[in-house]
Each structure stands twice: as C-alpha cells, then as structure tokens.
UniProtKB/Swiss-Prot annotation:
It comes from Shewanella loihica (strain ATCC BAA-1088 / PV-4). One of its GO terms (molecular function) is [glutamate-ammonia-ligase] adenylyltransferase activity. Involved in the regulation of glutamine synthetase GlnA, a key enzyme in the process to assimilate ammonia. When cellular nitrogen levels are high, the C-terminal adenylyl transferase (AT) inactivates GlnA by covalent transfer of an adenylyl group from ATP to specific tyrosine residue of GlnA, thus reducing its activity. Conversely, when nitrogen levels are low, the N-terminal adenylyl removase (AR) activates GlnA by removing the adenylyl group by phosphorolysis, increasing its activity. Its cofactor is Mg(2+). Its EC number is 2.7.7.89, 2.7.7.42. This is Bifunctional glutamine synthetase adenylyltransferase/adenylyl-removing enzyme. HAMAP family: GlnE (MF_00802). The gene is glnE.
Length: 956
C-alpha cells in the first residue's frame, strides 16, 4: 500500500501536528538529531492524524526509535502471547500486572494506528492484529491470575483430581477475529466441572474460586488507572445477565441454553469462540453449544428474530437521534452482519461449513454454496470493508468507541487524508453508496416489506382546502356526516401553520395527513379520534423521523387511531413519550404481550444495547422499557387480547424485573466506588427488597407507586472481623447499605426525558419516615414482634420478597410467618381493624353524590382487603398455611378450604374484588375518576358489607 506520509497534510491537520510536535520536543529535546528528515516528516504526519498516537508518544518518546527500527512492519501475531507471558512472569502483584498490560496494549495500539493511518496495513490484517492483541492480553492476564490464585487457594479440580481451567468465550467481533480499534469486549466465563480446590489451606468450591477469579480478571482489564484501561469488559451476555453468577460450569451453561436460551442469544453465539490455546475443553465447549445455535433443520424462524432485533436497533437510533451512524444506521455494519448471520442460523445446521465465527469466511462459503451470487458477495464485502476502514480510523483518532461520522472539519480532513479522498463530499458519497448497497441486500434477505407511497386521495384535497363550504361539500360527497371534523381540522391546521417545523417536516406532514384522515373518516365519530391523535402529532411535529414513521407504516397509523379512540390514557402516553410510536409498527408484536417469566430476559436484552458505563442512558433505557411494555399491556387490555385478570400480574412482573435491574445497577455503582461488604461471599449481596401493598399483593395498576422496604443481614456482632467494604475507598458496611438504598431510590425517582421510573414509598419500613432507610433483618423481625402496630401487621399480610439474596428470602418468609402467627385476642383485633378502617374512610373518602368510590366507599376494595387481613391475623396461629400467600384472591381460597370463611362468602368477596379492580384498570385507561354510579355496584356492595359486618363486627 502507498505510504501516505509522502502526501502534504491539510492546513488544519498540519496545525495540530505542529502543536503535538512542540510537546514532544519538550519531552525529548534532541529529537531532531535522533531522526532522519523522512522519519521526522512521517512522525509529524501521524501526529496530525491521531491525537491518541501523539498523546502516547509524548508520554513514552522511547517507543519512537523502536517503532522506526522495525516495529512498524508486520509482526507475527503469535508473538503477542509469548511476549506478554514472558513479561508477566516477573510481576509480583496485580498493580504491576495492570501497568504491564496497559502499557503493552497502548504501545501495540500506537503501532497499529500508525500502520492504519499511513497505509502500511490492509484492513483485514489490522482486524486480525487487533483481535490477536486483545486475546493475548486477556489470556495472559487470566494465566497470571490463575497461578496466583492457585497458590493462594489451591488448584480447582474435578472429582478425579484433574485441574480445571477458567475458559473464556470471546463474543462478537472478538470471537470473529474482526475487532475494531477501540472496542469493548463481550466475554462469558465458564469452567468444565464442579469440584473443590486442592493444595490450599482450606478447600473451596470450584465455582466460588472461579467467580473470585473472574471478578479480579475483569478488574485487571477494566479498571482505569494512570495508564488508562486495557479493555472495557462487558459480561452481560452471560446466562441471566447481571443477575446471574459471573461464572457457571459447562453443565450450567448447557442447561441454561437448552431450557431458557433466547433467539438473540443464538445470534450472539454464532461468533462465540473459546479464547487461548485450543484444548479438548475448547472442543467440548463448542460441541455443547452447537445444537443451541445451529438447528438440525433449515430454520427460517431465525429471519423473524433477526428482523425484530433490527427493529429494536432502528428504534434506538431514532430515540437517541443518532445520525451518520455507520454501524447502526440503515445500511450500516450491523446490517451486513445480520445478512450473513441470517444464512448461518437458517442453514448452519445442515451446512457445517457455515459454522464459523468469521464474517469474511462465512460470506465466501455462502457464495460456494450458491446462496449468494458473486455480485452480491463482492458488493457486500467491498461495502463492509469501506465502512470498517472508516470505523477503525474514526476510533484511532482519539481511542474513542464511536461509529458516528465527524462533526468537525478537522476529523473529516484526517479521514479523507488517510483514505486518499479529496474531501468530505467525496468521502460521504462513497459511504452513502456503500450503505445503500448493504441496505438493499438487507431488505432482500431480512428486512421484510416496506410500504410504498400510494396514489393521491380525496383526503389530500380536504387537507389543502381553505374554504369552509368546499370542505363541507367534499365531506358530504364522501358520506362523512359529522359536522365537528372540519372545524377541528381547520383550527389545528392553523395552529400548525404557526409552528417552526422546517421544510422536510412540513412536506412529510402534508403526505401523512391524507392517510390519517382516511383512518378517521372510517369511524362513526371521526372527531373523537382526531382530537387525541392531534395531541400526539403536536409533540412530533419537530421530530420528522416520527412523522415519517407514521407515513411509511400503515399499521402504525391504524394502531395510533384505534388506541387513541379506545383509551385517552394511551393517547396521553403516546403524546408524552413519542418514542412509543415505534411499538405500533408491527401490530402482531404490539399485542404479543411478553410472557410473565420473560420480563427479566427481555429487559436484559433491551439494556444490552446501552453501554454499561453510561448511567444516564441506562436510566433512560429502563424507563423506555417500562413505558413500551406498559403500552403493550394496555393495548392488549383495551382490545380484550389480554384477559383483565392478568393485567395486574403483567404490571407486577414488569415492575419486579425493573426492580432487579435497578438494584443491580445501584450495587455496581456503589461497589465500584467503595468495594463490597467484606463479609460477603462472591455473588452475594446480603440485601433484599420487600414489596408491600399492591406490589406485594401482585395487584399493581397502570399508575401504581411501589411500597418497598429494604433489608440487609449484617451486624458487627455476627461478623466482628468484617466492618468495612473492601474497595479503594472503604466505608462502614452499614453506611454501604445506606448508600445502596439511596442510590436505588435515586435511580427510581430521577426524572429523565422519559419521566420517572416509579414513585417509591418507603413509609412502611420500621418506625416509618423516622426509621432507617434500610434495616437489618433480625431488627426488622424484633420490631414487628415487639413494636409494630396492628396496621403494620395488616400491611405485612400483603408483604412479599421481590429481589435479593436467597438466604434473606428464606429468613424473611420465616419472620413474616412468625409475626402473622402471633396469638391475638380476636375481639380486640377486630376493634383495632375497624377503627383503622374508619379512620381511613374519614381521611380519604371523597366521592360525588350518587357515586361509589372503588377503593374507599363502604363495601369497596379497602373493606375487602381489611376482611382478608383480619382473618389472616386472627387465624394464622392455628392455621400456618394462611401465611403462604400475600394476594387477596388466594387468601380467600385458603380461608374457604380451611372453612374459616363460608365458600359462598369467599366466592362473593373474590368476585367483588376482581370486578372492582377491573373497573379501576378500565377507568384509569379512560382517565376517569375511580368512581362508578352507585346502582351499578349495589349487588357487590351489599354482599361485601354483609360479610364485613359478620366478620369484623361479630369478631369471627
């Protein structure tokens, strides 16, 4: 390849080169005597092109001579591993290892960036070098750490005494040996067999050994020091993501993928590769994963899965307003990967040659198998190479993980110089041409049908009319009798005319409105649909991409109109959060409500698209996931697709999945700063979240807040040797849990562009608002037994463990059962429950005349809940099974089975309770007050009041 240093630098680039050169001259005064004129010119050229190279060489000028003495030529990739192992052999502690790894990484990255910018290397060689370097750094760190830990804890062995290694799966581009310049690395840690360590002072379970090792290995690579980092390590692709153990055995891995593996995990596994020297364990691992990834039959279902994944990416691009993104945009790098991997997933079960991690290898195989024509292969490869070259150079400018084209002239000039282009316009033309070719093949292979623009309609004429008589005549001619539509449309159009939309937005609106009007006029009351839809349009007039989304997707238009008609609440959600319009594109997917058990894995997949270290985007993603899933539940609810009995179940399971991720994120953020409590074993948190009220009773509604209590299991008496966390900034363990609780509440309550996640109410904790934010679990138990009021025991009936350590779950269950089973005077208990109910009614009941408040009116939801709570508190001493459930419906079932409540009474209470809750959901979606006409509920109310009288006034 041509040496680009012989070309003259553009003016702006040359200025930057001179600035860096001055810095180097200060660090190395006799530089001019050490270098030839040609070397000086070349060094100045690379200084102008890459701030990263200049920064590193100004810090380490001694590298320059060795680079010119032969390091800039092609090096054998195998040498990375042997060099690193040799250097690390002399390291005594992890701080030394961190310094060695980072300096080696930076030195090699300088060499590779130099070769890339000045045309010394073909792209494929650069990608192979970058991948080999990453693999060598990971494996050298692993091997050094394994040796240290075996000395410290003994060697992990299987049942026959064979040493067990830590196996590392490299995912994504690392697995495919196609790593880009400044990439994070996705890894999965695993080990072959369970067993124990041998040769240490005390034996330790293999999994605990490898979890400790995995944590330390991530820290060796990930932590930012004065020398930077080695790689940003992302472990979220492991089974169960952040909520799963950091390391699992081969059998644990196999069980997970056989029983719970998702389609997106199949896609991720196509590129999975065991890193390091190949061994029998590597073969075993790949043989085990193969049946999950590659089905024995031709598997066309993979296409739909990839299509959904691409839709998620498109939504993310739109929501984050990512423009000029050569990876995620239409025709970007990801679309080439989708095209190739769709063939691999469909046919890899039948064609062993397709079972490879390399995209280049797979695409050549597709040509040999006749699946792609020569022109398609050539255009895809050349376009992909073009985009990957641009991506690599973009990242090598400042060692930044970016796929977005430059915002500034300087970086455009750097790219154009390295690529031999005259300027931004020429380079943009090449990039746009490459992306257009890729997108064409993507649509043919994966993309599905896209709507075409269709012929002019009479509604287009209506949208452009000014004269009232003409408009009314046109409407009448086409059978639209409603008189309110035209005045509403004309008024709104006048308001829109005053808005600053821009030519593209106005043009798109003019194309969209005739289609929306077609939807309105098919309805009996078009204006009733137009008004809420116009509020949504008001919010997206300046977001042209959303106007285009509605124009290009007939299904989205139909769903927008029908859902706004069915529920003002949904209309308001769409207006407040326009990103939800993405959910309307595919009606089949919109009404395919996530199954209850899948919320955690769906959320995990959703969060994978956001960098783990970007806390702001993580918080935003949590809120967007909640909003989109809530929309799906509401859409299925108002259209009758989801039975009303299941609405609360879905809203509750959704909340639990979010609680899990919030706690994990908070834990990660606090422990990153302070370390973890030193008394904990790896993977333990010593922390639990307890749900009260609707969260505890599996009865959340659309606008429900969360009643939560936080518990931990640490006391100084129990763990006298552990008083602080084990991080760089240690703090008292009690203070750690307080910070964790505060962080959790912050993540819930922070208002981002997508609003607040949930409102959290902590007043049910011991001593209420004056109590500690997080309580030690035994203190919680003693408080409940000795200090809590009856109303707090009533609240405990509806309490349920939501997330945290299993040991705390078991202990909380015991404590709750013990407190509920305390012997109580039934007459005194009934009196206290009645008084509390009356107090609530006095303070909270505000109802219009002739109406019934679903919650607080006599015979309403609160009365039913108090009946259940009284009966549990009065009878659990003799019937412990009453403490099993926290939801009212199952409590009534158990009371009926135990004959503590007549079967007919239990049935009437359940029917009334479900009816009132269903009406509550319906009224929320209609944005109506929680009231019904009194006569509509009389039968249910009379039954409830009769049972209330019998149970609580007679002290049953």
């Amino acid at each position: 390849m041509e040496n680009m240093s012989e070309q003259a630098l553009p003016h702006e680039v040359n200025q930057v080169a001179e600035q860096h050169w001055q810095r180097l001259a200060e660090a190395w005064p006799d530089i001019s005597e050490q270098l030839t004129p040609e070397q000086t010119k070349e060094l100045k050229t690379i200084f102008g092109l890459s701030d990263f190279v200049a920064e590193q060489l100004c810090r380490h000028p001694n590298w320059i001579v060795s680079l010119f003495e032969g390091q800039l030529s092609m090096l054998a990739r195998d040498s990375f591993s042997s060099e690193l192992h040799s250097i690390l052999a002399g390291a005594n502690d992890e701080e030394q290892v961190k310094a060695i790894l980072r300096r080696y990484r930076n030195r090699q990255m300088v060499r590779l960036a130099w070769r890339d910018f000045l045309g010394y290397a073909e792209l494929n060689d650069s990608l192979l070098d970058l991948s080999a370097l990453a693999e060598a750094l990971i494996i050298a760190a692993r091997d050094w750490l394994y040796g240290q830990m075996c000395q410290q804890y003994g060697t992990p062995c299987d049942s026959e005494g064979n040493p067990q290694p830590l196996m590392i799966l490299g995912m994504g581009k690392l697995g495919g040996r196609e790593l880009n310049f400044s990439s994070d690395i996705d890894l999965i840690f695993t080990f072959p067999e369970h067993g124990e360590t041998q040769g240490g002072r005390r034996s330790q379970d293999n999994q605990q050994f490898f979890i400790r090792m995995g944590q330390r290995l991530v820290n060796l690579l990930n932590q930012v020091t004065v020398d930077g980092f080695v790689y940003r390590v992302d472990m979220r692709l492991r089974p169960y993501g952040e909520s799963g153990p950091l390391v699992v055995s081969f059998s644990g891995l196999e069980d997970y993928y056989q029983e719970q593996g998702r389609d997106w995990e199949r896609y991720a596994m196509v590129k999975a590769r065991a890193l390091g020297p190949w061994s029998a364990y590597s073969d075993e691992l790949h043989d085990m994963l193969r049946p999950f990834v590659y089905r024995r039959y031709i598997d066309f279902s993979a296409i739909e899965s990839l299509r959904k994944m691409k839709q998620l990416i498109t939504q993310e691009v739109r929501r984050r307003r990512l423009t000029d993104n050569i990876k995620l945009g239409a025709g970007g790098i990801r679309e080439v990967e989708f095209v190739v991997q769709s063939f691999q997933l469909i046919r890899g079960g039948r064609e062993p040659a397709l079972r490879q991690q390399s995209l280049f290898g797979a695409i050549d195989t597709l040509y040999k198998l006749g699946q792609l024509e020569y022109l398609a292969v050539d255009e895809l490869k050349q376009s992909y190479l073009m985009l990957r070259r641009v991506e690599n150079l973009l990242q090598a400018i400042g060692d930044q993980q970016t796929q977005t084209l430059p915002q500034h002239l300087l970086d455009w000039q750097r790219l154009c110089f390295a690529l031999g282009m005259a300027g931004e316009a020429e380079l943009r033309t090449h990039i746009e041409s490459a992306m257009a070719k890729i997108h064409r093949y993507f649509k043919e292979t994966v993309g599905g049908q896209e709507s075409d623009e269709v012929a002019e309609q009479w509604t287009a004429q209506l949208w452009s009319l000014v004269d009232d008589e003409d408009a009314e005549a046109l409407l009448k001619e086409h059978g639209v009798e409603e008189s309110e539509l035209w005045p509403a449309l004309k008024s709104w159009r006048g308001t829109v005319a005053k808005r600053t939309i821009g030519p593209r937005g106005r043009e798109t609106l003019d194309k969209l409105m005739p289609w929306l009007l077609q939807e309105f006029i098919q309805l009996p009351t078009p204006t009733k649909a137009f008004l809420p839809v116009s509020k949504v349009l008001d919010q997206i007039l300046t977001r042209t991409t959303y106007l285009e989304l509605l124009f290009e997707n007939p299904g989205a238009r139909q769903q927008l109109v029908s859902l706004c008609m069915a529920s003002p609440w949904i209309g308001e959600q769409l207006a407040k959060f326009p990103m939800l319009l993405d959910e309307l594109i595919d009606p089949a997917q919109l009404y395919d409500t996530t199954s209850l058990d899948d919320y955690p894995s769906e959320l995990r997949q959703y969060l994978l698209r956001v960098p783990e270290e970007d806390m702001e985007q993580q918080m935003e993603a949590l809120r967007q996931f909640k909003l989109s899933q809530q929309l799906k539940i509401a859409a299925a609810d108002v259209t009758g697709v989801l039975p009303v009995m299941q609405v609360s179940d879905h809203l509750t399971f959704l909340a639990e999945a979010i609680i899990e991720q919030v706690v994990l994120q908070a834990w990660q953020q606090v422990s990153k700063r302070h370390g973890t409590p030193s008394y904990l074993a790896p993977e333990e948190m010593g922390f639990a979240v307890i749900g009260y009220g609707k969260a505890g009773g599996l009865e959340l509604g659309y606008g429900s807040d969360l009643d939560l209590v936080f518990l931990h299991n640490y006391t100084r008496d129990k763990y006298p040797d552990a008083q602080q966390t084990n991080g760089d900034r240690p703090i008292d363990i009690g203070h750690f849990y307080l910070k964790l609780a505060q962080r959790i509440l912050h993540l819930f309550s922070t208002r981002t562009t997508s609003g607040e996640l949930y409102e959290v109410d902590m007043r049910l904790r011991p001593s209420g608002a004056s109590g500690l934010l997080v309580s030690e679990i035994e203190y919680f138990g003693s408080y409940q037994r000795e200090e809590a009021w009856t109303w707090e025991h009533q609240a405990l009936v509806r309490a349920r463990f939501l997330f945290g350590d299993n040991r705390l779950a078991a202990r909380f269950s015991e404590l709750r059962a013990d407190v509920l089973a305390m012997e109580r005077d039934k007459a005194e208990l009934a009196k206290e429950v009645r008084e509390m109910r009356q107090k609530m009614r006095t303070h909270l009941l505000k109802v219009d005349e002739g109406c019934f408040d679903l919650k607080q009116s006599p015979g309403g939801i609160a009365d039913i809940e108090f009946i259940a709570q009284y009966l549990v508190l009065a009878n659990t001493h003799d019937h412990p099974e009453l403490a099993i459930w926290s939801d009212n419906v199952r409590i009534f079932e158990v009371l009926s089975e135990l004959e503590l409540l007549p079967h007919l009474s239990a049935q009437h209470l359940t029917q009334a309770y479900c009816y009132l809750r269903d009406e509550s959901h319906r009224l929320t979606l209609q944005q109506a007050p929680g009231q019904l006409p009194q006569e509509s509920v009389d039968l249910h109310v009379q039954r409830v009041l009769a049972i209330y009288e019998q149970v609580l006034n007679n002290g049953q």
